[in-house]
């Protein structure tokens, strides 16, 4: 009898663990719709700047910059206007290298520099598989967007943590787990020092100052914005903020004193972050060298 009960308990534990197990598509859903915030660029918005959820990922914001004019493309599995005809390997290459497949109307053409392939390069193989599984599962929507116009060669500044990569040992450390999330979330793409189209990740990591004019990453009609200093500097950055204040800014878009954060800050996506992931992100931000 005791043996039977013990076996039953083991079976119940196994069933419980299986019930909690996350499928690749679920993991992809979590990454795409939280820290990576893919819909922030790739989903259309209404006249009030609100996401049109029933048209998610069918093409979104237009970026009109000195180097290029590009509309975030349709990444639904529609075969004609989206990525439905792309192989898994081609989707992964677009993510981590920023290059389209060698077939179709735009064969081999680089994706615009706003696509953060220099950050996505850090994605772990299992996470890449998960993202592809999720994108395959979203509703296909027929929607052709305008072709990109390039005024200069596409360039992406190497991001140190993405170049170094993340081994499995890194995930035992909350700070390194946070670094991975901040990397694939391309937070420092906006929040690092920026000059003449070049990011300064070496001496300006997290210092902010990048200016986003109204047509560079903001919904139609929205004002421009300037990325904030997110280093732990006590006055210029977030060093004096509590963990709760940092968490609220990330997930609600509200800073200390009630200041509302502006686009392209993707707090509506970050609101779904797991508490553990949010804590790791904060731990990493606390570890960044303070800059003024």
Segments predicted by a language model, with ranges:
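Extended, well-folded interaction surfaces typified by the phenylalanyl-tRNA synthetase beta subunit core
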Residues: 143-154
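Bacterial N-terminal signal peptides
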Residues: 3-16
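Electrostatic cytochrome c docking/interface patches
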Residues: 17-33, 48, 155-183, 196-198, ...
């Amino acid at each position: 009898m005791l043996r039977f009960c013990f076996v039953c308990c083991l079976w119940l534990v196994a069933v419980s663990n299986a019930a909690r197990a996350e499928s690749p598509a679920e993991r992809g859903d979590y990454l795409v719709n939280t820290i990576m915030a893919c819909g922030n660029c790739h989903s259309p918005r209404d006249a009030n700047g609100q996401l049109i959820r029933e048209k998610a990922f069918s093409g979104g914001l237009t970026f009109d910059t000195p180097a290029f004019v590009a509309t975030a493309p349709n990444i639904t599995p529609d075969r004609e206007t989206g990525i439905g005809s792309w192989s898994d390997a081609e989707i992964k290459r677009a993510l981590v290298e920023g290059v389209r497949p060698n077939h179709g109307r735009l064969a081999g053409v680089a994706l615009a520099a706003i696509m953060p392939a220099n950050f996505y390069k850090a994605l772990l193989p299992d996470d890449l598989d998960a993202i592809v599984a999720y994108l395959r599962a979203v509703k296909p929507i027929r929607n052709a967007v305008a072709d990109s116009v390039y005024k200069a060669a596409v360039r992406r500044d190497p991001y140190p943590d993405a170049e170094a990569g993340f081994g499995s040992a890194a995930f035992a450390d909350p700070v390194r787990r946070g670094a991975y999330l901040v990397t694939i979330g391309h937070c420092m793409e906006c929040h690092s020092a920026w000059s003449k189209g070049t990011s300064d990740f070496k001496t300006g990591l997290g210092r902010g100052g990048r200016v986003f004019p109204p047509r560079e990453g903001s919904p139609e009609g929205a004002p421009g914005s300037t990325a904030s200093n997110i280093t732990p500097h006590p006055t210029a950055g977030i060093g004096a903020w509590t963990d709760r204040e940092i968490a609220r800014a990330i997930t609600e878009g509200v800073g200390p004193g009630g200041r509302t954060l502006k686009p392209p800050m993707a707090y509506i996506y970050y609101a779904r972050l797991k508490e553990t992931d949010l804590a790791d992100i904060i731990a990493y931000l606390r570890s960044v060298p303070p800059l003024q």
